[in-house]
Amino acid sequence: MSTWLLPENIADVLPSEARKIEELRRHLLDRFRSYGYEMVMPPLLEYIESLLTGGGHDLNLRTFKLVDQLSGRTLGLRADITPQVARIDAHLLNRQGVTRLCYAGNVAHTRPRGLHATREQIQIGAEIYGHAGLEADLEIQQLMLDALRLAGLAKVRLDLCHAGVLAALIEAEPAAAELGQSLYDALAGKDVPRLVELTANLTPVIRDALRALPTLYGDASVLDEARARLPNAPAIARALDDLAFLASQVEGAEVMIDLADLRGYAYHSGVMFSAYVDGVPNAVARGGRYDHVGQAYGRARAATGFSLDLREVARISPVEARSSAILAPWQHDEALRVSVAALRDAGEVVIQALPGHEHDLDEFAFDRVLVERNGNWVVEARA
């Protein structure tokens, strides 16, 4: 085996792609800050018990595990930063009011999420803690749409779901709870034949409701159909009311209702949402409410947030990274050194061509040159 080969679904990020990713990261973090979100940096490794707390079966399967050579305990290489940020809010910050936090960092997955997906993502996201009202859900959804707009993804479809619908159905039918992961997988995959098989022995009301979920997809009017086909339980009525409110308030995206879009259901407790764009089969961003996760760290807090993979969003973004630069000669000249330093301080990219390599600079678009005119170094358009 060649020594330079990388593991499957792991890849280097080359200069042009890295530049685009980094510029997008900076733009998004600046936008998060403009909303009042504070940056946190959780560790890449944690003890596995802490890392998987409240994360469910799926997170466990996606997490790389290794043995700590100092303590002998099992460590996990994070697959999702969201639970780590919940731990920081609940256990370290210990604030009583609303807290807004954001983050950006690498995560690793044991298996790829899709056919061509990478197992090492650059996850960026934002979370609100301390407010249980729909105002927080609306703010975080608008922030996600704002982030996608900054990436040049103007035509976005926002799919809304609610974990409370399935939770209420399972609570009403103990036999449904015993189906566990199989029921969730069938719903999330819209595998109707499998769903029919799994629900065959349930009471008719719950059976029919579960079988209806994959078909309850469409614009906000599908909520009327949901009210007619699902049990008239208070928890279900509240969930549908929440979705109706958010669907009427979201701006800048086509809003759809999908009551079977349950990815991440294991730790979500309320409204869930996903963003889709044309030409991309999977969601480009996901989020939702997870009020109970903080309880595992000693303090239950209302919480909602979203995250996306910077590498994937940068790949599909039509916005090109700024690669223009000023070409300057390499000379032992104090005035030249001062001019180059001043331009760089002003935010310009200035590249000095090393002797003998004046024609090797293909990575940048040199639209200007630094030339000497009458004893002064000035920037001119490149011919």
Swiss-Prot record:
Keywords: Amino-acid biosynthesis, Cytoplasm, Histidine biosynthesis. The keyword Cytoplasm applies. InterPro entries: aa-tRNA-synth_II/BPL/LPL, HisRS-like_core, HisRS/HisZ, HisZ. Disulfide bonds: none annotated. The keyword Phosphoprotein does not apply. It comes from the Bacteria. GO terms for biological process: histidyl-tRNA aminoacylation; L-histidine biosynthetic process. It is found in: Cytoplasm. One of its GO terms (cellular component) is cytoplasm. Pathway: Amino-acid biosynthesis; L-histidine biosynthesis; L-histidine from 5-phospho-alpha-D-ribose 1-diphosphate: step 1/9. GO terms for molecular function: histidine-tRNA ligase activity. Heteromultimer composed of HisG and HisZ subunits. Required for the first step of histidine biosynthesis. May allow the feedback regulation of ATP phosphoribosyltransferase activity by histidine. Belongs to the class-II aminoacyl-tRNA synthetase family. HisZ subfamily. This function is generally fulfilled by the C-terminal part of HisG, which is missing in some bacteria such as this one. This is ATP phosphoribosyltransferase regulatory subunit. It comes from Paraburkholderia phytofirmans (strain DSM 17436 / LMG 22146 / PsJN) (Burkholderia phytofirmans).
